[in-house]
Amino acid sequence: MSLKGKSAIITGGSRGIGRAIAIMLAKEGVDVAFTYVKSSIEAENLKSEIEKQGVQSLALQIDVRDFDKTKELVEKTKLAFGQLDILVNNAGITKDMALMFMTKDDWQSVIDTNLNGLFNVTRNAIVTFLKQKSGNIVNITSISGITGMARQTNYASSKAGIIGFTKSLAKETAAYNIRVNAVAPGFIETDMVSSLKEEYKNELKKVIPLGRFGTAEEVANTTRFLLSDESNFITGQTIVVDGGLSIR
C-alpha cells in the first residue's frame, strides 16, 4: 500500500483501535510514534511489538490536552525519525450519563480530550505538513457523532465536532497536497465495549445488520487504506465502520 519508509504519530496508541493501527502501520514499514496516558507496561509492550516489524518506534507519555506537550510530540517524532508524514488522531475518552446528571467537568473533560486534544496535535503537525506540501491525517470519530446516542451528549458532541473539523481542514489544505479524512467506528471489540453487560451486548448485536461487533483490526484496515496512495483522490470524508448499524 506504498507506506514503507514513512513516519506516523498515533495518539492514544497503546491499546484498542490505536494499538491495532500502530501494529498494522508498522507491518507496512512505517516508523511509529504513539502517545499513552497511564500504562507504561502496555506502552513498552507495543513499542516492542512495533520494533519486531523492523521499524523504529517512539512511546511518549503525553496528555493531548496540553498544547505545549503536543508541540514536543511533533518535534520529538521528527527528531527521532527525520520526518513526519502521517497523523492519526485516536485519543479519546467517554463519560456516559444522562444530561441531567452530567456535571460541567463531565462535559468539559470529554470535550477537552476528544476535540481540543485533536486540535492541539493537528495544529502543531499541520505546520510541518504545510511546509513540506504533503501529509495525511485520519481522525477517529464515532457513529455517535453521526446518529447521536442517548447518554452521550458530551461524547457525541465531541465526535460530531471532529467530523466538521475534518471537512473544514480538508478544504483548507487540499491545495498543499494534504489529505484529511475520518473513520467512524460503531461497536468495536475493545475495553469500552467489553465493559458492557452481556445482555446489553446481545441486544446490540441484534440491531447490527452484520450481527456482530467489529474488531480493532477492521478499523485499522480502513485507516490504512485512507493513509495509502490507493485513496489519493479521497479527502474530507468520513468512512463508517459499523456493520451497517447506522444505515438509514
Language-model-detected regions and their locations in the chain:
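Active-site helix of classical SDR
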Residues: 122, 158, 166
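Residue(s) in the substrate-gating loop at a strand-loop-helix junction
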Residues: 142
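Conserved glycine-rich Rossmann-like NAD(P)H-binding loop of the short-chain dehydrogenase/reductase
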Residues: 28-45
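Substrate-binding pocket helix/loop in short-chain dehydrogenase/reductase
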Residues: 98-99, 106-111, 193, 204
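Alpha-helical segment proximal to the catalytic Tyr-Lys
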Residues: 127, 171-175, 232
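Conserved glycine-rich cofactor-binding loop
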Residues: 7, 14-16
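Short C-terminal tail/terminal secondary-structure segment
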Residues: 147-150, 206-207, 224, 235-248
